[in-house]
Swiss-Prot record:
This is Transcriptional regulator MraZ. The keyword Transferase does not apply. GO terms for cellular component: cytoplasm; nucleoid. Belongs to the MraZ family. NCBIfam families: division/cell wall cluster transcriptional repressor MraZ. It comes from Actinobacillus pleuropneumoniae serotype 5b (strain L20). One of its GO terms (biological process) is negative regulation of DNA-templated transcription initiation. GO terms for molecular function: DNA-binding transcription factor activity; transcription cis-regulatory region binding. Keywords: Cytoplasm, DNA-binding, Repeat, Transcription, Transcription regulation. The gene is mraZ.
Length: 152
């Protein structure tokens, strides 16, 4: 399970270093292979261990090619999906296309989301998290049915 937020630098080749605490698990359980794609709702990237991505692929495969919205989701999620193999130093290469989508520059935020990571441009992450925290006491959140029984 991936959790927490880590600030990471991107080198001049577009590589990021996966935090040390995740490397052994990713190598042992996922052969050090991850899949990176775009988030269709946010200006960030989604980084899945290979086995988790295979589950996502099955869900994408189950969508209809004849429904325009479902086909769009397949096209974007699968079309941008790129395998990233960790090197000996625990780094992965993010393609220029993926970096451009998320407007990634020198500093990024790697955000653990249980079975995957989100990769954000630093300033966009700060803005998004401020917006998310402000929503905490809003009527919209208080009236959300899915959250009414959530006990933390």
């Amino acid at each position: 399970m991936f959790r927490g937020v880590t600030s990471i630098s991107i080198d001049n080749k577009g590589r990021i270093a996966i935090p040390t605490r995740y490397r052994a698990e990713l190598r042992e359980q996922h052969e050090g292979v991850l899949v990176c794609t775009v988030d269709i709702r946010q200006p960030c990237l989604l980084l899945y261990p290979l086995h988790e991505w295979e589950t996502v692929e099955q869900k994408l495969l189950a969508l209809s090619n004849f429904e325009p919205m479902q086909r769009r989701i397949q096209r974007v999620m699968q079309g941008f999906a790129t395998e990233c193999e960790m090197d000996a130093a625990g780094r992965i290469l993010l393609s220029p296309t993926l970096r451009q989508h998320a407007q990634l520059e020198q500093q990024i935020m790697l955000v653990g989301q249980l079975n995957k990571f989100e990769i954000w441009q630093d300033k966009q992450w700060q803005s998004q998290i401020a917006e998310d925290l402000a929503l905490g006491g809003s009527a919209e959140m208080l009236n959300c049915e899915a959250l009414k029984n959530l006990s933390l």
